[in-house]
Amino acid sequence: MFMLNLLTMIVPVLLAVAFLTLVERKILGYMQLRKGPNVVGPHGLLQPIADAVKLFTKEPLRPLTSSITMFIMAPILALTLALTMWIPLPMPHPLLNMNLGVLFMLAMSSLAVYALLWSGWASNSKYALIGALRAVAQTISYEVTLAIILLSTLLMSGSYSLSTLIITQEYIWLILPSWPLTMMWFISTLAETNRAPFDLTEGESELVSGFNVEYAGGPFALFFLAEYANIIMMNALTTTLFLGAWNNPTTPELYTTNFAMKTLLLTMSFLWIRASYPRFRYDQLMHLLWKNFLPLTLALCMWYVTMPIMMAGIPPQT
């Protein structure tokens, strides 16, 4: 039964990822005053299926000098971790209601760094290695602020379980009392998922394609799926943390619809940002984090820690 539940979670995620690629190409197309994919199927609806068939029927080539075990393991690890992070997400009922669901998600996103590092190192190519080092430095840096912002929101909800956040936000979304945190969280998720304007890892002009430059066919498709699954997952987490939908226990499907709509809107904003903004320079990327976000998030975290202590001495107002 658990395996069936697991499948009913994984299959929709993979389907969503497949059609997100189509939505992205369509939106970017219309923003650049062109059509986007419109040949395969009605309005290009079968394009993701054609892409999948093309990628998985290609011969998975590998460089002669690569470390074969790591080279094959890296994309598998990337996709496995991307799908594992969906387990504690409440929609409104999670697959596993973990006491420390937030910590689990942080740990899984930290492990994703290994997939990037392995793929760059095992390819035995200087472009892949430089791309991987960039990706790892960026991911590790932005995880610092993500962790602090998560801690601040948890101080407001009072539990490490994600399901508690639904109850916390019955009366007010957490985006309202903590909008600076939300802004920084959203920008950090862009950087964490290597999306424009922070897509330094795949700087085509200097690194060809980044850490996955030597991958082709199936393994490349796995990296691609992992990247887009992470994007949807990060937006789903943003919805859970800051835009919590109201959950009526008798009609859980209303929560799911609400949750999906908000996640979709956030994902659209990712694509909108990609079409609108140019890429950051690498030093600007690091300055933004270490000199702007980190001091601000630390100050706000201290504020959320001290606030209940300061208020504790005030007698109840009737």
UniProtKB/Swiss-Prot annotation:
Q: Which PROSITE patterns match?
A: COMPLEX1_ND1_1, COMPLEX1_ND1_2
Spell out the Pfam families in the cross-references. Answer: NADHdh
Lineage summary: Eukaryota, Metazoa, Chordata, Craniata, Vertebrata
- A GO term from the CC aspect: mitochondrial inner membrane
What top-tier enzyme class does this entry carry? translocase
The membrane-spanning stretches of this chain are 2-22, 68-88, 100-120, 147-167, 171-191, 217-237, 254-273, 294-314
What this protein is called in its record is NADH-ubiquinone oxidoreductase chain 1
- Organism equals Hsunycteris thomasi
Which family does this protein fall into? Belongs to the complex I subunit 1 family.
The domain of life is Eukaryota
Q: What membrane topology does the UniProt entry give?
A: Multi-pass membrane protein
Q: Can you state which reaction this protein catalyses?
A: a ubiquinone + NADH + 5 H(+)(in) = a ubiquinol + NAD(+) + 4 H(+)(out)
